[in-house]
Amino acid sequence: AVQRQGLALVTRRELEVLRLVTAGATNREIAQELVLAETTVKTHVSSLMSKLQARDRVALVLLGQKVLLQ
């Protein structure tokens, strides 16, 4: 339920980042794919972790798998 509330706050760009994180891409690879600075990707990942209450990147990937399969 908490993740669902957080998901409502996720931006379109953060959703793109989540898709790539879930696919196993590194921050550098995500930055290249989305034409962003690596620090911007780190900011998006941190924001996603906060919004979705993921304690680490692995938890974020697991949440991403659930969210993206719906």
Q: Where are the model-predicted features located?
A:
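A broad detector of short, well-ordered amphipathic alpha-helices
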Residues: 15, 59-62
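Regulatory hinge/linker segments at domain boundaries
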Residues: 1-20
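Recognition helix of helix-turn-helix DNA-binding domains
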Residues: 24-59
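Short, locally clustered residues in the helix-turn-helix/winged-helix DNA-binding domain
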Residues: 19-23, 65
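Intrinsically disordered, low-complexity basic tails/linkers immediately adjacent to helix-turn-helix/homeobox/MYB/SANT
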Residues: 63-70
